[in-house]
Every structure is written in structure tokens, then in C-alpha cells.
Amino acid sequence: MIHTAFCRRVLALALTGATLLSLTACGQEPTDGTTEPTVATQPATEATVPTEATVTETVPETVPEPVETAPPETEPTEPTEPQILYEYRVLHEVNPDVIGWMTIPGTVIDYPVVQSLYERNFYLRRNYLKQNATCGTLYARERCDVFKPADNITIYGHKMGNGTMFADLHNYKQKSFWEENKYIHFDTIYEHHTYEIFAAFRSTADLSIGFRYHIFDDAANQAEYDTFVATCKSLADYDTGITPQLGEKLITLSTCDKSIDQGRYVVVARMIE
């Protein structure tokens, strides 16, 4: 009897183990790594109603939302004032109307340039020190923005009988002279610039018939710029083969020409550096 009871217990344990293995193989994942021993109970007389499994909702970890931070406030920087070139500081201190210096290699033109913003032709008979002088000095049209600069800067100078001031502009009536001396160096008090001459022509101060080159400062559009350039080239004594394009800054030099009534001789150049 003892042997038979022992055999039954062994058989019961074996059957229990087989049942557990069968349940695990069907996808039921154990809740932990140990298995509670099975306690045999009497079969229930009434059908057991299965209870609903409790589902535990997993709350995802809260991810903090990015916080927008304003960039650090910075003090607004004031625009830096341009520095006057060393070589022109004394001149500008002597007369704040001094705006630069013009030199044309191959000519005697090597003079300061001034501008009176409030009185037209103020320097027609005054030197750069504002002293009375028959020869005057080279001066820019009062409405031109020399430092921006405008699309065109007009500068006037006398044709003196002794060959000074703008008298040498008349040499540009000959193409051979232009070929050897086609560059103008015009420095403002702040910057060095070089211009290339593209047209030289006669005109008149009689506005009813003359080319009003002197009132062209800033082009309202490309057509206006192109018209100015085309007119200069059509009046020119010869073709230089140079046609400035919108965006290229121009300089117009004007002096007297006594070959015609109220005559003017005009040299026009484009900035190349």
C-alpha cells in the first residue's frame, strides 16, 4: 500500500508539471521567475465564473516640453562713422567743404574738390579756402551725393588761359590723347577711386537746345540711366568702345568751350575701382 500511494503521488506531480509546461507553451507569460506549488482541492460542485483580468495601464513617462527662451537682449550698435583718410584730414579741418581730391595723369589737373550744399556756384570765383579767386576751384554740383555715391557726380572747373584748372580736358578732343590718358583718380575724403573715361563731347549751357547732362544725379530706372549713357556716346568726338551698365557709378567733368555759344566741353567716366 505504501508503495502504491507513493507511486500515485509521483504520478500526480508528473501530471501537474506537464500541465504547467503545456500552459506556458501556449503564450502565457509567468509573472515572476518562481512557480507556487499546486495545492490539490476538491472539485467544485458549481461552475466557477471566471473573473475579469485586471489590466494595468502603463502611463508613459512625461517628457517635458521644450521651453522657448528669448535670446539675450543686446544693445543696438550705432553705425560706425567713416574715418577721413589721413592725407585729407588737414584739408578738411581747414575747410569742411573739401570733399576730395582729383588727379588726371598726363594733365596738370591735381586739385582739391569742394562742395557747397547750400549755395549754387559758391566756388565759381573762390578758391578752396573760400577766398576770392578768378580761377575758382573744382567743385561738385550741390545736389550730388558724393559719398553714397550718386549714379553721377558732376564736377565743374574753369578753362583758364594759363592752362590750369580744367583747361586740359580739351586734350580729350583727340582720341590719341584719350588712349594714353584714359583714367581719372578721384578720391573722396573717405575712399580712393579710379574712373575710366568713356566719352568726351561738346555741348551748350543753353538748356533749350543743349544736353542737360549736369542735372543727372540718380537714375529713376534703367531706361533713364541707359539714355544718359547713350546720349553721351552719341555726342562723343570718337567711340571708346566702352558702354557703362546700370550700377556703375559715373563722374562728369564740365568746363567752358568757346568754340560755340555758351559752349561746354564735357568728359564722362565710369568708376572701375
Residue ranges with predicted function:
Residues 2-14:
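Bacterial N-terminal signal peptides that target proteins for export
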Residues 4-6, 58, 256:
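Generic extreme N-terminus detector
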Residues 22-25:
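C-terminal motif of bacterial Sec signal peptides marking the signal peptidase cleavage site
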Residues 27-29:
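Bacterial signal peptide processing site
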Residues 31-80:
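Intrinsically disordered, low-complexity serine/threonine-rich repeat tracts
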Residues 61-273:
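Solvent-exposed, non-transmembrane regions of membrane-associated and secreted proteins
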